[in-house]
């Protein structure tokens, strides 16, 4: 069933009316806001936001927030004599393994990499996993090796019990 052209034109009229009403309402709201902002800016725009701790005034809330963060930072009390007698050894970074000294933490980090690699190579010399069953079973001069025609389960049974004790499994498909 098709719509009549008159139904389409009627719905378009409604859409046009709604759009024009929305445009009118937006322009009215914008004018109201502009009036409020212009009156407020003349009276309270300068130094509108005030810090509760030190009573300093700021133009924006963001600036006040950044300033408030500075009140939370701990203040360092430094003795000037300690600064003068500051020893260079205190600024040096010391390797805990070989007691070598470095000027920066980055240099110490690069040096520590040498210790880590030497530890890894020492650990890799000694195998961490010990296998209880040998893959190859040597018996006098003949070698028993894995039979690739058998399943892994059958191979394990052969290695454990020998060929004579393994049950024969027929894997032929029945039609």
Curated annotation (Swiss-Prot):
Transmembrane segments: none annotated. This is Zinc finger protein ZAT18. Contains a slightly degenerated ERF-associated amphiphilic repression (EAR) motif, which may be involved in the activity of transcriptional repression. Mostly expressed in stems, siliques and leaves, and, to a lower extent, in cotyledons, hypocotyls and roots. SUPFAM superfamilies: beta-beta-alpha zinc fingers. Its main location: nucleus. PANTHER family: ZINC FINGER PROTEIN ZAT18, ZINC FINGER PROTEIN ZAT5. A motif (Nuclear localization signal) lies at residues 71-78. Induction: Induced by jasmonic acid (MeJA) and gradually by wounding. Accumulates in response to dehydration stress. Induced by cold, osmotic, salt and drought stresses in roots and shoots, and by UV-B and wounding in shoots. One of its GO terms (molecular function) is DNA-binding transcription factor activity. SMART domains: ZnF_C2H2. Disruption phenotype: Decreased tolerance to drought stress. The keyword Nucleotide-binding does not apply.
